[in-house]
């Protein structure tokens, strides 16, 4: 892993609940329309989703530690292994239905399916990069991207890709500064209306 002024390490099972909380906090404006009145279930659902990604989705997570190992200040997920997409989808649906009920689960599953991504064997896929609000602008996001790219190289990936919403200008500037370039776009009337996301940009970088 690259050297940084703070500790970047691979996440452990004990970190999954904290990662889930970070993700919900970091994307709160996107999760509210998805979970609605069941927002109180969002962290529990996300924790189980992160666990499913780790066990079935070929995803590894990296975290930035605070002063104590249990204190997580930032996190990122990177898909570098093989994913059992069928089992992953069934697992997520079971979690959603159990915690939200059938109708809300169907709605949540539809919105959570965006942006669409098809795995490529030679490419790593980065997701859910989040930094706690009070620790932003300290280089943690760059450090996590650097570590994720390094891990991807260890798994012989040739490129790394990620999605970002067209209105997330700080993230776009960060990725462009790191050498990511736009490869394609997805337009969704559904996410445009309900999440305020008109387009999803797919960015790639050669490793």
Go through each PLM region and give its residues:
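Active-site rim helix/loop that mediates acceptor-substrate recognition in acyltransferases
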Residues: 38-61, 66-67, 72, 77
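Conserved acyl-donor/pantetheine-binding loop and adjacent beta-alpha core of acyl/acetyltransferases
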Residues: 82-124, 191
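Conserved acetyl-CoA-binding loop-helix of GNAT-fold acetyltransferases
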Residues: 131, 137-150, 173-177
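Glycine-rich phosphate/pyrophosphate-binding loop shared by adenosine-nucleotide-utilizing enzymes
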Residues: 4-6, 69-75, 124
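Conserved GNAT acetyl-CoA-binding A-motif
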Residues: 123-124, 152-163
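Conserved GNAT-fold acetyl-CoA-binding loop/helix
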Residues: 27-49, 85, 97-99
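C-terminal "cap" of GNAT-fold acetyltransferases
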Residues: 158-161, 165-172, 177-178, 188-207
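A short beta-loop-alpha structural element at the N-terminal edge
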Residues: 7-21, 32, 81
């Amino acid at each position: 892993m690259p050297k940084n002024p703070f500790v970047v390490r691979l996440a452990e099972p004990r970190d999954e609940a904290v990662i889930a909380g970070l993700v919900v906090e970091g994307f709160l404006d996107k999760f509210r329309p998805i979970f609605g009145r069941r927002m109180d279930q969002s962290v529990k659902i996300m924790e189980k989703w992160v666990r499913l990604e780790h066990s079935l989705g070929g995803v590894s997570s990296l975290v930035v530690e605070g002063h104590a190992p249990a204190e997580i200040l930032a996190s990122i997920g990177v898909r570098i292994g093989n994913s059992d997409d069928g089992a992953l989808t069934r697992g997520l649906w079971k979690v959603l239905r159990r915690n939200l009920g059938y109708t809300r689960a169907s709605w949540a599953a539809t919105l959570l399916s965006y942006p669409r991504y098809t795995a490529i064997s030679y490419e790593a896929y980065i997701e859910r990069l989040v930094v706690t609000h009070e620790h932003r602008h300290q280089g943690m996001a760059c450090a996590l991207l650097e570590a994720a790219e390094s891990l991807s190289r260890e798994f012989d990936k040739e490129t790394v890709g990620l999605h970002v919403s067209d209105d997330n200008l700080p993230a776009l500037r960060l990725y462009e500064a790191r050498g990511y370039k736009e490869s394609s776009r997805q337009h969704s009337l559904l996410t445009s209306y309900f999440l305020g996301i008109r387009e999803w940009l797919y960015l790639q970088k050669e490793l």
